[in-house]
Amino acid sequence: MAGLVKLSCLVLACMIVAGPIATNAALSCGTVSGNLAACIGYLTQNGPLPRGCCTGVTNLNNMARTTPDRQQACRCLVGAANSFPTLNAARAAGLPKACGVNIPYKISKSTNCNSVR
């Protein structure tokens, strides 16, 4: 029993130490969602394009500098797109351009994020 407790403590300690290292390898979906929260009305209710939305798009683009970060951001965007049944696909695909940002893939529910470089 004591060995099991020690093993559990060791595993927990490794998770605590390695967790932040693994998290820094790519953007989190929380970061992606947080940066794009101001875009929801524009993308789902045909509202106006808020300045805060474009600020978030620009920030996200600036954070996604490596291939793993861009692929992770893409996966988060695809997941978010699939969670909104009222998503305007044309507005989602055109969002980066509307904000003056160039990203290397189209935002859609079916983007193959493994091909993003």
UniProtKB/Swiss-Prot annotation:
Transmembrane segments: none annotated. SMART domains: AAI. InterPro entries: Bifun_inhib/LTP/seed_sf (IPR036312), Bifunc_inhib/LTP/seed_store (IPR016140), Plant_nsLTP (IPR000528). Residues 1-25 form the signal peptide. It comes from Brassica oleracea var. italica (Broccoli). Keywords: Disulfide bond, Lipid-binding, Signal, Transport. This is Non-specific lipid-transfer protein B. Disulfide bonds join C29-C76, C39-C53, C54-C99, C74-C113. One of its GO terms (biological process) is lipid transport. GO terms for molecular function: lipid binding. The keyword Secreted does not apply. Plant non-specific lipid-transfer proteins transfer phospholipids as well as galactolipids across membranes. May play a role in wax or cutin deposition in the cell walls of expanding epidermal cells and certain secretory tissues. It comes from the Eukaryota. Pfam families: Tryp_alpha_amyl. Belongs to the plant LTP family.
